[in-house]
A protein has these predicted regions:
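Hydrophobic residues in well-ordered beta-strands that form the structural core
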Residues: 90-91, 115-117, 223, 249
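Contiguous beta-strand/loop segments that form the cofactor/metal-binding neighborhood of enzyme cores
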Residues: 174, 181-301, 345-351, 374-376
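Rossmann-fold dehydrogenase core element
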Residues: 103-120, 140-145
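Beta-loop-alpha module in the N-terminal Rossmann-like domain of NAD(P)-dependent dehydrogenases
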Residues: 18, 47-107, 340-343
Length: 380
Protein backbone atom coordinates (compact mmCIF):
# COMPACT_ATOMS: atom_id res chain seq x y z
CA UNK A 1 0.00 0.00 0.00
CA UNK A 2 1.37 3.36 -1.03
CA UNK A 3 1.68 6.00 1.68
CA UNK A 4 0.70 9.39 0.25
CA UNK A 5 2.75 12.34 1.43
CA UNK A 6 0.70 15.44 2.20
CA UNK A 7 1.69 19.08 2.64
CA UNK A 8 -0.63 21.58 4.32
CA UNK A 9 -0.59 25.28 3.38
CA UNK A 10 -2.02 27.25 6.29
CA UNK A 11 -1.46 25.86 9.77
CA UNK A 12 -4.01 27.65 11.91
CA UNK A 13 -6.65 25.84 13.94
CA UNK A 14 -8.20 23.98 11.02
CA UNK A 15 -4.84 23.07 9.50
CA UNK A 16 -3.87 21.52 12.83
CA UNK A 17 -7.24 19.71 12.98
CA UNK A 18 -6.63 18.17 9.54
CA UNK A 19 -3.14 17.09 10.58
CA UNK A 20 -4.51 15.50 13.77
CA UNK A 21 -7.03 13.35 11.89
CA UNK A 22 -5.00 12.58 8.79
CA UNK A 23 -2.05 11.27 10.77
CA UNK A 24 -4.38 8.50 12.01
CA UNK A 25 -4.68 7.14 8.44
CA UNK A 26 -2.39 4.25 7.50
CA UNK A 27 -2.03 5.42 3.89
CA UNK A 28 -1.19 9.08 4.63
CA UNK A 29 1.78 10.94 6.07
CA UNK A 30 1.73 14.70 6.61
CA UNK A 31 5.36 15.62 5.98
CA UNK A 32 5.27 19.40 5.49
CA UNK A 33 3.45 22.58 6.33
CA UNK A 34 3.71 26.13 5.04
CA UNK A 35 2.59 28.93 7.31
CA UNK A 36 3.40 32.62 7.20
CA UNK A 37 2.51 33.19 10.85
CA UNK A 38 5.06 33.67 13.59
CA UNK A 39 5.05 30.40 15.51
CA UNK A 40 7.75 28.95 17.74
CA UNK A 41 9.38 26.11 15.82
CA UNK A 42 8.56 23.70 18.65
CA UNK A 43 4.86 24.15 17.82
CA UNK A 44 5.38 21.97 14.77
CA UNK A 45 5.74 18.23 15.26
CA UNK A 46 6.46 17.79 11.58
CA UNK A 47 9.34 17.00 9.25
CA UNK A 48 9.40 20.15 7.11
CA UNK A 49 8.27 23.68 7.93
CA UNK A 50 8.15 26.23 5.12
CA UNK A 51 7.41 29.93 5.49
CA UNK A 52 6.81 30.37 1.75
CA UNK A 53 4.07 28.24 0.21
CA UNK A 54 5.90 28.13 -3.13
CA UNK A 55 8.59 26.02 -1.48
CA UNK A 56 5.99 23.50 -0.33
CA UNK A 57 4.34 23.01 -3.71
CA UNK A 58 7.78 22.54 -5.29
CA UNK A 59 8.77 19.86 -2.75
CA UNK A 60 9.20 16.76 -4.91
CA UNK A 61 8.31 14.40 -2.05
CA UNK A 62 4.76 15.73 -1.70
CA UNK A 63 1.88 14.00 -3.52
CA UNK A 64 -1.11 15.99 -2.25
CA UNK A 65 -1.34 19.64 -1.22
CA UNK A 66 -4.05 20.73 1.21
CA UNK A 67 -4.80 24.47 1.02
CA UNK A 68 -6.27 25.94 4.22
CA UNK A 69 -5.82 29.69 3.78
CA UNK A 70 -8.13 32.72 3.48
CA UNK A 71 -10.35 32.14 0.42
CA UNK A 72 -8.94 34.94 -1.75
CA UNK A 73 -5.66 32.96 -1.96
CA UNK A 74 -7.23 29.66 -3.01
CA UNK A 75 -7.20 30.05 -6.78
CA UNK A 76 -3.58 31.18 -7.09
CA UNK A 77 -2.31 28.44 -4.79
CA UNK A 78 -4.46 25.66 -6.25
CA UNK A 79 -3.47 26.46 -9.83
CA UNK A 80 0.22 26.73 -8.91
CA UNK A 81 0.10 23.41 -7.05
CA UNK A 82 -1.52 21.60 -9.99
CA UNK A 83 1.02 23.09 -12.40
CA UNK A 84 3.74 21.78 -10.05
CA UNK A 85 2.33 18.27 -10.45
CA UNK A 86 0.47 18.09 -7.15
CA UNK A 87 -3.02 16.80 -6.45
CA UNK A 88 -5.05 19.28 -4.39
CA UNK A 89 -7.59 19.23 -1.59
CA UNK A 90 -8.82 22.81 -1.44
CA UNK A 91 -10.64 24.27 1.55
CA UNK A 92 -14.06 25.72 0.74
CA UNK A 93 -15.00 27.96 -0.93
CA UNK A 94 -13.18 27.05 -4.12
CA UNK A 95 -12.61 30.77 -4.70
CA UNK A 96 -14.26 34.12 -4.02
CA UNK A 97 -15.11 35.02 -7.63
CA UNK A 98 -16.47 33.30 -10.70
CA UNK A 99 -13.34 34.23 -12.66
CA UNK A 100 -11.00 32.60 -10.14
CA UNK A 101 -13.14 29.47 -9.97
CA UNK A 102 -13.13 29.15 -13.76
CA UNK A 103 -9.33 29.46 -13.72
CA UNK A 104 -9.13 26.51 -11.31
CA UNK A 105 -11.38 24.44 -13.59
CA UNK A 106 -9.27 25.37 -16.61
CA UNK A 107 -5.99 24.50 -14.87
CA UNK A 108 -7.36 21.14 -13.75
CA UNK A 109 -8.36 20.33 -17.31
CA UNK A 110 -4.93 21.38 -18.63
CA UNK A 111 -2.89 19.50 -16.02
CA UNK A 112 -5.07 16.44 -15.41
CA UNK A 113 -4.34 16.62 -11.68
CA UNK A 114 -6.98 15.55 -9.16
CA UNK A 115 -8.57 18.37 -7.19
CA UNK A 116 -11.65 18.71 -5.06
CA UNK A 117 -13.02 21.14 -2.50
CA UNK A 118 -13.50 20.35 1.18
CA UNK A 119 -17.30 20.26 1.30
CA UNK A 120 -16.85 17.47 3.83
CA UNK A 121 -20.47 17.57 5.06
CA UNK A 122 -21.29 15.42 2.02
CA UNK A 123 -19.44 12.62 3.84
CA UNK A 124 -21.63 12.91 6.95
CA UNK A 125 -23.60 9.62 7.33
CA UNK A 126 -26.92 11.42 7.93
CA UNK A 127 -26.54 13.59 4.83
CA UNK A 128 -25.37 10.60 2.78
CA UNK A 129 -28.53 8.69 3.71
CA UNK A 130 -30.85 11.56 2.83
CA UNK A 131 -29.03 12.00 -0.49
CA UNK A 132 -29.76 8.31 -1.18
CA UNK A 133 -33.41 8.74 -0.17
CA UNK A 134 -33.67 11.71 -2.52
CA UNK A 135 -32.14 9.80 -5.41
CA UNK A 136 -34.50 6.85 -4.85
CA UNK A 137 -37.58 9.08 -4.74
CA UNK A 138 -38.76 7.23 -1.63
CA UNK A 139 -40.07 10.40 0.03
CA UNK A 140 -41.21 12.09 -3.17
CA UNK A 141 -39.65 15.36 -4.26
CA UNK A 142 -37.81 17.74 -1.97
CA UNK A 143 -40.00 20.86 -2.01
CA UNK A 144 -38.42 23.17 0.57
CA UNK A 145 -35.14 23.58 2.46
CA UNK A 146 -34.81 26.03 5.36
CA UNK A 147 -31.39 26.57 6.96
CA UNK A 148 -31.06 28.63 10.13
CA UNK A 149 -27.45 28.99 11.24
CA UNK A 150 -26.67 30.95 14.41
CA UNK A 151 -22.88 31.03 14.79
CA UNK A 152 -20.66 32.53 17.46
CA UNK A 153 -18.47 35.54 16.74
CA UNK A 154 -16.44 35.52 19.97
CA UNK A 155 -13.34 34.26 18.16
CA UNK A 156 -13.77 36.74 15.29
CA UNK A 157 -12.35 40.12 16.29
CA UNK A 158 -13.41 43.07 14.10
CA UNK A 159 -10.03 42.98 12.32
CA UNK A 160 -10.20 39.21 11.59
CA UNK A 161 -9.92 38.35 7.89
CA UNK A 162 -13.37 36.71 8.06
CA UNK A 163 -15.02 40.16 8.07
CA UNK A 164 -12.87 41.45 5.19
CA UNK A 165 -14.99 40.56 2.17
CA UNK A 166 -12.05 41.06 -0.18
CA UNK A 167 -10.38 38.14 1.61
CA UNK A 168 -13.31 35.93 2.66
CA UNK A 169 -15.95 36.80 0.09
CA UNK A 170 -18.40 37.42 2.93
CA UNK A 171 -20.49 35.01 4.97
CA UNK A 172 -22.50 33.53 2.08
CA UNK A 173 -19.32 32.71 0.16
CA UNK A 174 -17.01 31.72 3.03
CA UNK A 175 -19.61 29.79 5.03
CA UNK A 176 -22.89 29.59 3.13
CA UNK A 177 -21.43 27.44 0.34
CA UNK A 178 -21.59 24.44 2.69
CA UNK A 179 -25.37 24.65 2.84
CA UNK A 180 -25.89 25.56 -0.81
CA UNK A 181 -23.91 22.42 -1.61
CA UNK A 182 -25.96 20.28 0.79
CA UNK A 183 -29.22 21.43 -0.83
CA UNK A 184 -27.77 20.73 -4.28
CA UNK A 185 -26.75 17.23 -3.19
CA UNK A 186 -30.04 16.46 -1.43
CA UNK A 187 -32.23 17.63 -4.30
CA UNK A 188 -30.19 16.95 -7.43
CA UNK A 189 -31.69 20.17 -8.80
CA UNK A 190 -30.12 23.23 -10.45
CA UNK A 191 -30.65 26.82 -9.33
CA UNK A 192 -32.60 29.19 -11.59
CA UNK A 193 -33.12 32.28 -9.40
CA UNK A 194 -31.05 33.63 -6.49
CA UNK A 195 -31.81 36.51 -4.11
CA UNK A 196 -29.90 37.88 -1.12
CA UNK A 197 -30.22 40.39 1.71
CA UNK A 198 -27.92 41.36 4.57
CA UNK A 199 -27.36 43.47 7.66
CA UNK A 200 -24.23 45.40 8.65
CA UNK A 201 -23.40 45.73 12.35
CA UNK A 202 -20.95 48.47 11.43
CA UNK A 203 -18.67 49.45 8.56
CA UNK A 204 -16.37 46.48 9.20
CA UNK A 205 -18.82 43.68 9.98
CA UNK A 206 -21.65 42.38 7.82
CA UNK A 207 -22.85 39.88 10.40
CA UNK A 208 -26.28 38.65 9.24
CA UNK A 209 -27.16 37.45 5.74
CA UNK A 210 -29.96 35.57 4.04
CA UNK A 211 -30.58 34.04 0.65
CA UNK A 212 -33.52 32.55 -1.22
CA UNK A 213 -32.86 30.16 -4.07
CA UNK A 214 -35.36 28.76 -6.58
CA UNK A 215 -34.48 25.51 -8.37
CA UNK A 216 -35.46 24.04 -11.71
CA UNK A 217 -37.77 21.30 -10.39
CA UNK A 218 -39.67 23.42 -7.88
CA UNK A 219 -37.47 23.39 -4.80
CA UNK A 220 -37.44 26.71 -2.91
CA UNK A 221 -34.68 27.10 -0.31
CA UNK A 222 -34.13 29.77 2.34
CA UNK A 223 -30.81 30.28 4.11
CA UNK A 224 -30.11 32.50 7.13
CA UNK A 225 -26.67 32.92 8.70
CA UNK A 226 -25.86 35.08 11.73
CA UNK A 227 -22.36 35.46 13.16
CA UNK A 228 -23.52 37.67 15.99
CA UNK A 229 -23.69 35.95 19.36
CA UNK A 230 -21.97 33.89 22.04
CA UNK A 231 -21.11 30.24 21.63
CA UNK A 232 -23.89 29.29 24.06
CA UNK A 233 -26.46 30.20 21.40
CA UNK A 234 -24.67 28.53 18.49
CA UNK A 235 -27.23 26.39 16.70
CA UNK A 236 -27.92 25.14 13.19
CA UNK A 237 -31.10 23.52 11.92
CA UNK A 238 -31.76 22.17 8.44
CA UNK A 239 -35.47 21.65 7.74
CA UNK A 240 -36.50 19.54 4.75
CA UNK A 241 -40.03 19.29 3.36
CA UNK A 242 -40.56 16.33 1.02
CA UNK A 243 -43.89 15.25 -0.46
CA UNK A 244 -44.08 12.44 2.08
CA UNK A 245 -41.96 13.69 4.97
CA UNK A 246 -40.98 16.56 7.21
CA UNK A 247 -37.40 16.37 8.49
CA UNK A 248 -35.42 18.50 10.92
CA UNK A 249 -31.65 17.95 11.15
CA UNK A 250 -29.61 19.51 13.97
CA UNK A 251 -26.06 20.79 13.76
CA UNK A 252 -23.98 22.47 11.03
CA UNK A 253 -22.13 19.17 11.25
CA UNK A 254 -25.31 17.07 11.38
CA UNK A 255 -25.50 14.86 14.47
CA UNK A 256 -29.18 14.09 15.01
CA UNK A 257 -32.71 14.91 13.94
CA UNK A 258 -36.33 13.87 13.67
CA UNK A 259 -38.74 12.92 10.91
CA UNK A 260 -42.45 12.43 10.38
CA UNK A 261 -43.34 10.56 7.20
CA UNK A 262 -46.19 8.86 5.40
CA UNK A 263 -44.92 5.44 4.43
CA UNK A 264 -45.57 1.97 3.11
CA UNK A 265 -43.54 -1.11 4.04
CA UNK A 266 -40.83 -0.38 1.46
CA UNK A 267 -40.36 3.24 2.55
CA UNK A 268 -40.39 2.23 6.22
CA UNK A 269 -37.58 -0.21 5.49
CA UNK A 270 -35.53 2.56 3.87
CA UNK A 271 -36.01 4.80 6.91
CA UNK A 272 -34.53 2.05 9.08
CA UNK A 273 -31.22 2.62 7.27
CA UNK A 274 -30.91 6.17 8.69
CA UNK A 275 -28.17 6.07 11.37
CA UNK A 276 -29.58 5.63 14.87
CA UNK A 277 -33.17 5.40 13.62
CA UNK A 278 -35.77 4.95 16.39
CA UNK A 279 -39.54 4.97 15.83
CA UNK A 280 -41.40 7.12 18.37
CA UNK A 281 -44.90 6.83 16.89
CA UNK A 282 -46.56 4.64 14.26
CA UNK A 283 -50.22 4.98 13.19
CA UNK A 284 -52.36 3.52 10.42
CA UNK A 285 -53.53 6.30 8.09
CA UNK A 286 -57.07 4.93 8.23
CA UNK A 287 -57.13 5.67 11.97
CA UNK A 288 -56.00 9.31 11.63
CA UNK A 289 -58.31 12.18 10.81
CA UNK A 290 -57.08 15.26 8.93
CA UNK A 291 -57.59 18.07 11.46
CA UNK A 292 -55.96 20.82 9.39
CA UNK A 293 -59.28 22.71 9.31
CA UNK A 294 -61.40 23.62 12.37
CA UNK A 295 -64.59 21.88 13.42
CA UNK A 296 -67.57 22.92 11.34
CA UNK A 297 -65.52 23.47 8.18
CA UNK A 298 -66.56 20.18 6.68
CA UNK A 299 -64.81 16.96 5.79
CA UNK A 300 -61.34 17.78 4.39
CA UNK A 301 -60.23 14.17 3.92
CA UNK A 302 -61.90 13.65 0.55
CA UNK A 303 -59.77 16.21 -1.29
CA UNK A 304 -56.50 14.70 -0.10
CA UNK A 305 -56.93 10.93 -0.09
CA UNK A 306 -58.75 8.20 -1.91
CA UNK A 307 -59.08 4.58 -0.90
CA UNK A 308 -55.84 3.79 -2.70
CA UNK A 309 -53.71 6.95 -2.96
CA UNK A 310 -52.65 9.97 -0.93
CA UNK A 311 -52.00 13.06 -3.02
CA UNK A 312 -49.24 15.67 -2.78
CA UNK A 313 -49.03 18.38 -5.43
CA UNK A 314 -51.39 16.38 -7.60
CA UNK A 315 -49.22 13.25 -7.45
CA UNK A 316 -50.64 10.11 -5.87
CA UNK A 317 -48.64 7.91 -3.48
CA UNK A 318 -49.46 4.47 -2.11
CA UNK A 319 -48.90 4.90 1.63
CA UNK A 320 -50.76 3.46 4.60
CA UNK A 321 -48.93 4.55 7.77
CA UNK A 322 -47.77 7.72 9.49
CA UNK A 323 -44.41 7.21 11.20
CA UNK A 324 -42.48 9.57 13.47
CA UNK A 325 -38.97 8.91 14.67
CA UNK A 326 -35.57 10.22 15.63
CA UNK A 327 -32.05 9.57 14.38
CA UNK A 328 -28.65 10.28 15.89
CA UNK A 329 -24.99 9.52 15.30
CA UNK A 330 -23.21 7.84 18.24
CA UNK A 331 -19.98 9.85 17.88
CA UNK A 332 -19.13 13.31 19.18
CA UNK A 333 -19.13 16.34 16.88
CA UNK A 334 -15.32 16.25 16.76
CA UNK A 335 -15.27 12.56 15.85
CA UNK A 336 -17.85 12.97 13.09
CA UNK A 337 -16.01 16.02 11.74
CA UNK A 338 -12.68 14.17 11.87
CA UNK A 339 -14.03 11.12 10.07
CA UNK A 340 -15.49 13.37 7.36
CA UNK A 341 -12.12 15.01 6.65
CA UNK A 342 -10.50 11.57 6.60
CA UNK A 343 -13.15 10.37 4.15
CA UNK A 344 -12.65 13.23 1.69
CA UNK A 345 -8.87 12.71 1.64
CA UNK A 346 -9.36 8.99 1.04
CA UNK A 347 -11.82 9.87 -1.73
CA UNK A 348 -9.10 11.96 -3.42
CA UNK A 349 -6.64 9.07 -3.06
CA UNK A 350 -9.15 6.65 -4.64
CA UNK A 351 -9.51 9.06 -7.57
CA UNK A 352 -5.71 9.28 -7.93
CA UNK A 353 -5.48 5.48 -8.06
CA UNK A 354 -8.54 4.99 -10.27
CA UNK A 355 -9.44 7.77 -12.69
CA UNK A 356 -12.89 6.17 -13.20
CA UNK A 357 -13.74 6.62 -9.52
CA UNK A 358 -16.40 9.32 -8.98
CA UNK A 359 -15.69 11.76 -6.19
CA UNK A 360 -18.53 12.39 -3.74
CA UNK A 361 -17.86 16.11 -4.23
CA UNK A 362 -16.45 17.22 -7.57
CA UNK A 363 -14.87 20.52 -8.53
CA UNK A 364 -17.95 21.15 -10.67
CA UNK A 365 -20.19 20.62 -7.62
CA UNK A 366 -18.14 23.14 -5.66
CA UNK A 367 -18.36 25.62 -8.55
CA UNK A 368 -22.17 25.28 -8.59
CA UNK A 369 -22.41 26.04 -4.85
CA UNK A 370 -20.01 28.97 -5.22
CA UNK A 371 -22.08 30.50 -8.02
CA UNK A 372 -25.16 30.52 -5.79
CA UNK A 373 -23.08 32.17 -3.07
CA UNK A 374 -21.67 34.78 -5.46
CA UNK A 375 -25.09 35.63 -6.90
CA UNK A 376 -26.73 35.91 -3.47
CA UNK A 377 -23.86 38.14 -2.31
CA UNK A 378 -24.18 40.40 -5.35
CA UNK A 379 -27.94 40.75 -4.86
CA UNK A 380 -27.86 41.57 -1.14
Amino acid sequence: MKKYKVGIIGYGGFGKFLHHWWEKLDNVEVIAIADSGKHPEQDFDIEKVYHDWHDLINDTEIDIVSIVTPPNLHAEMACAAMKAGKHVLLEKPAATTKEDALQILKTQEETGMIITVNHMIRYNPIIQKFVQLGQSGALGKLRQVVVNNYAQDEALAPDHWFWNEEMSGGILIEHGVHFFDIANALSGQKYTEVYGVSNRRNELQRDRVAAMVVYNEGLIANYYHAFSGPGFFEQTTISLAYDLARVEIEGWMPLKGKITAMVNEKIKGQLEEIPGWTITQNQELDSIRDNSRPEGWGDSDSSVTSKELTYFGGVGFEVDEMVSGTFELPETKGEVYGKCVQAILNDVIQKIENKDHKLAITLEDAYEALMIAVLSSENK
